[in-house]
Amino acid sequence: MVDSHGLACNACGRCCNSAPTLSLRELFRHRDRFVGALTIGRVPKRRIGECWRAGHHGHALDADDVAACDALAERLLHRTGDAEREWIALTLQGYDYPSLGRCAALADDGRCSVHADKPSICGAVPLDPMLPDRLQSRVLAARRDDAAWLGADCIVETASARSFVESSFPVPLVTAGQVVDRAALDASRDALAFERAVWRDAVFASLIGGGQDVRHALSRLAPGGYLTVSIVPVLFAVASVSAHCRALSIGFIDAQRALIGMNIEAALARRHADDRPATRELRGFAQALERARHALAAMPTPAAEQTRHDAPRIEAWLDGRRDGDTLAA
């Protein structure tokens, strides 16, 4: 198993074939470009000796692998509390028509139109922030196969002298099993960890306390499966932090409703039958957002003593202020 890989990216845009996952901070920043949705995923607990698969590659997990998976899950995920001791992953996902086969941020020339301010996951890829560092070389081996299938050939084994891509010598990603430059990987994980206090813990508590129907729906998720639902529960959680956070949520709703309307209008003009399920879901999102806006606008302004003690930190984070950059570290 080769444990040293590099990235020889020539900005072809082939891997940008869907909308990214984002932190809420990033989604607020790019609210006019990405429709936000909440994804609820079931992540199985890893076990010693289990054959973990990444693409076509299999690997028998050892005790250190499992310990690393558990440590990362404790930080980023939520326990289901069932006998299997599995995990629930709550993330925010850009939602778009699958038939488009491209990220909404891609320009006509295939270049990223938000490159200078791209989501942290875009800087981390092809590494996977949801998996421990010790498995990243195996992630890259699998994604090397995917990149070759896409015709990109941008992930290379750095044992080779040079990339087959004409553009540049590959930038090292993993050398001898160790992540070389972990800034983007850490930024993505730190954002997930920080936003536990912003919305993820509250949304998870509401799911677990949502009654038997909700718990049954979660239990029916296959390991590795996920649900995509409206982002409204996230916005209610954030709006409860402070009056400023509520105003941010309302502004986000207005931008999202306008964006959804434009996306649906464009889909209707394309007249693709494959777009119909996504159109129905987007209309459902828009209706949920409209109801949420009315509810948030009717909420009384909380008194100063009712504002959360960590509200200034959360406001700085969601505003994208420079002093918020260090909060998640």
Per-segment meaning from a language model:
Residues M1-A329:
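Short loop/turn segments that flank or connect secondary-structure elements
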